[in-house]
Amino acid sequence: MNPLKKKPRTHSLQNAPEKPDWLKVKLAFPDPKNNPVAIVRNSLEEKKLNTVCESASCPNLNHCWSRKTATYMLGGDICTRRCSYCDVASGKPFPLDPEEPKRIAESSIALDLRHVVITSVNRDDLEDGGAAHFAKTVKEIRKGLPDCKIELLIPDLKVKQEALEIIFECNPDIFNHNLETVKRLFPEVAPQKRYERSLDVLKIASARGFLTKSGLILGMGETLEEVKECMQDLASVGVSLLTLGQYLQPTSTHLPVKEYVVPQVFKDLRIYGKSIGFKGVFSGPLVRSSYHADEQISWNP
């Protein structure tokens, strides 16, 4: 039986604005035998691992993999939630793979990573939302890479205190949870998420002393004033690091791009973010939550 239970979408690419030149990325490797992208892909395929890089059709895949960095995605490649902007499949997930944490650690060691980002699909079918699976993965990585920085990009876990405690006990170097969009757009963009719930997750983590991080995707119909209000909300709950990037419609069935935000606006928002207290604001059309994540931990222009 096919586990995917997709509802038909009605969006279209026909009325989407034309993609500007600043979003067109090319990356060439003169020596195919030493192509770093192929090296990372082969390692991931060998270990049968999922990455958000591929599952979410990230535009920076080639760039990040050429740096031999990747964001591992736990819990399979089927999400229990369905967001209109996201290219990850939704439906009924398979049971967790108990060997996945060990394989992720083996891949991280083989690639000699110095900054590992671990995220997951939403697993609302699990009592702890997959928190214990995160913990096992962190433990396995630290066995082989004790000096590696570990960033956890977690779902909201429905703000269950028991699940959050499991994450806190991992003691991640960065605690990341993406708000994604402004409050007004949540019902359309992420109907199974709650704006206040996401802020609560970040507030609790900040209060516990963790370096917290969040991200917004622009171009889905928000106004500049709404973005600034959202940034203020994130700063007020203690978020230190912020990423701002351009939304790109994955397929014709996903939410259409409403606007391609010009690079100058991203620059202005970076300045604004610094002015209201963020330690670092990584802002640009191609920026994603884990883009150059190893630099973001200390980035402070």
Curated annotation (Swiss-Prot):
Q: Where in the cell is it found?
A: Cytoplasm
Top-level taxon: Bacteria
UniProt entry tagged with the keyword Chloroplast:
no
Q: Which GO terms describe its molecular function?
A: 4 iron, 4 sulfur cluster binding; lipoate synthase activity; metal ion binding
Q: Which SUPFAM superfamilies match?
A: Radical SAM enzymes
Q: Where is the Radical SAM core domain?
A: 65-279
The record's free-text note on cofactor binding: Binds 2 [4Fe-4S] clusters per subunit. One cluster is coordinated with 3 cysteines and an exchangeable S-adenosyl-L-methionine.
Q: What is its EC number?
A: 2.8.1.8
Keyword hit for Phosphoprotein: no
Pathway in which this enzyme or protein is active: Protein modification; protein lipoylation via endogenous pathway; protein N(6)-(lipoyl)lysine from octanoyl-[acyl-carrier-protein]: step 2/2
| Residues noted as binding [4Fe-4S] cluster 2 in the record, renumbered to the chain | 79, 83, 86
What broad class describes the main subcellular location of this protein?
cytoplasm
Q: Which cofactor does it need?
A: [4Fe-4S] cluster
Which UniProt keywords are given for this protein, alphabetically ordered?
4Fe-4S, Cytoplasm, Iron, Iron-sulfur, Metal-binding, S-adenosyl-L-methionine, Transferase
Q: Coiled-coil ranges per the record? A: none
The entry sums up its family as follows: Belongs to the radical SAM superfamily. Lipoyl synthase family.
Can you say what this protein is called? Lipoyl synthase
Q: Which organism is it from?
A: Leptospira interrogans serogroup Icterohaemorrhagiae serovar Lai (strain 56601)
